[in-house]
Structure formats: structure tokens, C-alpha cells
Amino acid sequence: MRVFVYCRVAHDDSFSLEAQAAQLRRYAEQAGYTIIGATAEQGSGLTLDRPGLEKVTQAVLAGKVDMVLVNSIDRIGREWGMTQAYIDLLIQHKVKLLCIRDRLLFDKQGVTYF
């Protein structure tokens, strides 16, 4: 499974970004996933207009990704309608979203708790 690792913090906290990235990489390795890309950024969760998330989106649109791996759902966005729209975009392109801390998997079947 080809995964893109996405990390975000709202405020300058490089330790938190590093911790997220390490946790997600470890999870991917243990699951046998192939990490095809990773990005970590500082930015507001109140908008989807973020350079790091745009990198994820471009990989999704190019068909390079099977799953986006995040620490928690709020790393995508803080407002549910906006976050749901992004999840819908992923699913339209047959890409899953796995939130490891929340233990949520979003895919064409809906949402699964694992």
C-alpha cells in the first residue's frame, strides 16, 4: 500500500511535528506500507489552503497514493464540513484516510473504527 504521511501543528512546535512524523513512519513500517511522500507543516486547521496539504492533494490527483496517513482527523481540518469535503475528495480518487490516534479509517465503505 502506497501511503503519504501528513503532519500538521497549528503553532511553532517542531518537536510535535517530529513526534508525529516518527509515530506515523513507525506505524507505516510495521504495517508494511510504502511511504511515497511525507510532509510536515505549521498552519491553521481552519483552512485547507496549506502548502503541505496541497502536496498530498497533488499526489492523490496523480494517482500515486492509496492512503493518507495522519495522526488524528483534526490534522486535516478543525471544521467538520471542510474536513468531510477533503475526505470525499480522497474517496473519489479511491484513496483511504487512516487516523492512527483516533483509530479511524475512512474509505468508500464509510468510516471504520479499528
Functional labels for PLM-detected ranges:
Residues 1-114:
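Short, structured surface patches at the beginning of a domain
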